[in-house]
């Protein structure tokens, strides 16, 4: 990108730092040509090329239905401080559940250090499940004055 109004392409280390500083975004899913975006908390593991998240599911979860039918997900993470100061990162790839027994203790500890808490409203049973987004494509653009 050469036009400064459209920002600059971020380097890999800038993207990783931004993802782990923000640690929240919108996970975009699709089912029968319908899109569904959900706010999530995550931790980005550059060495493993993945974003890890601990998702909550209610009994009749629309989220689960969409996850089961989505081949490729998209995670959008952004910060907007003004028209001339913003950052946007998109992570796309396959999405799969991770058995909690397969997660090493240091990975879950790291997740809880990096990811931001999102409280789930009381009043129903919520089942927590680990998922990972395999980062097959990662891009970031930023504009600073």
Identify the function of each model-found stretch.
Residues 1-21:
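Extreme N-terminal tail/first-helix region
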Residues 22-58, 75:
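Short beta-strand segments
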Residues 48-50, 72, 94, 137:
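Structural motif
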Residues 56-58, 69-77, 85-96:
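Active-site-adjacent structural patch at catalytic or cofactor/ligand-binding sites
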Residues 56-61, 111-115:
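Short, solvent-exposed aromatic-acidic interface loops
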Residues 83-145:
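Charged, gly/pro-rich active-site loop segments
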């Amino acid at each position: 990108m050469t036009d400064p109004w459209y920002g600059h392409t971020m380097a890999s280390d800038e993207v990783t730092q931004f993802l782990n500083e923000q640690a929240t975004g919108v996970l975009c899913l699709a089912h029968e040509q319908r899109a569904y975006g959900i706010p999530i908390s995550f931790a980005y593991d550059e060495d493993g090329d993945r974003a890890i998240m601990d998702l909550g599911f209610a009994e009749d979860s629309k989220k689960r239905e969409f996850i089961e039918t989505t081949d490729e997900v998209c995670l959008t993470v952004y910060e907007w401080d003004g028209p001339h100061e913003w950052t946007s990162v998109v992570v796309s790839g396959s999405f799969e559940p991770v058995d909690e027994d397969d997660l090493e203790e240091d990975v879950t500890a790291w997740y809880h250090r990096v990811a931001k808490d999102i409280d789930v409203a009381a009043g129903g049973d919520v089942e927590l499940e680990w998922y990972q987004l395999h980062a097959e494509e990662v891009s970031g653009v930023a504009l600073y004055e």
